[in-house]
Amino acid sequence: AMAGTATVQGQGTR
């Protein structure tokens, strides 16, 4: 998963 806003993968910077 890549950093940033939440994606369809359900990961990201929160």
Swiss-Prot record:
Reaction equation(s) it catalyzes: 2 a phenolic donor + H2O2 = 2 a phenolic radical donor + 2 H2O
UniProt keyword terms in alphabetical order: Oxidoreductase, Peroxidase
Domain of life: Eukaryota
The EC number(s) this enzyme carries: 1.11.1.7
Top class in the EC scheme: oxidoreductase
Coiled-coil positions: none
Disulfide cysteine pairs (residue numbers): none
GO function terms (MF aspect): lactoperoxidase activity
Signal peptide: none
Keyword Oxidoreductase appears in the UniProt entry: yes
Homology family: Belongs to the peroxidase family.
Record protein name field: Peroxidase
Taxonomic lineage: Eukaryota, Viridiplantae, Streptophyta, Embryophyta, Tracheophyta
